[in-house]
Amino acid sequence: MSQTEKIEEAVPSYLCEEPPEGTVKDHPQQQPGMISRVTGGIFSMTKGAVGATIGGVAWIGGKSYEVTKTAVTSVPSIGVGIVKGSVSAVTGSVAAVGSVVSSKVSGKKKDKSD
């Protein structure tokens, strides 16, 4: 026996074979760069990125995990999402979220002695 034959015998057949085409069933594959919606029965979260949600609209980026009623799938994606009332950008699992914050800053008052 050669060494390659020993290696082939050591690996179980179920690890070498491709999965059947019908294993995905009703779960469509999400394409990279797509924005994921949070709607009835679907919850999406992002691992390895920082972000925020305002008013129920969320962004995703980096590597996301989609949890449905029947399955959990890992979806690698690089994308830009939307946060209501502000701007967000996702680049390589690092996010920058900017929004308008209005605060009153009073100017320095001069004393009459100056």
UniProtKB/Swiss-Prot annotation:
The chain crosses the membrane at residues 40-60, 78-98. It comes from the Eukaryota. One of its GO terms (cellular component) is membrane. Pfam families: UPF0444. Keywords: Membrane, Transmembrane, Transmembrane helix. It is a multi-pass membrane protein. Its main location: membrane. May play a role in bone development. Belongs to the TMEM263 family. This is Transmembrane protein 263. It comes from Xenopus tropicalis. The gene is tmem263.
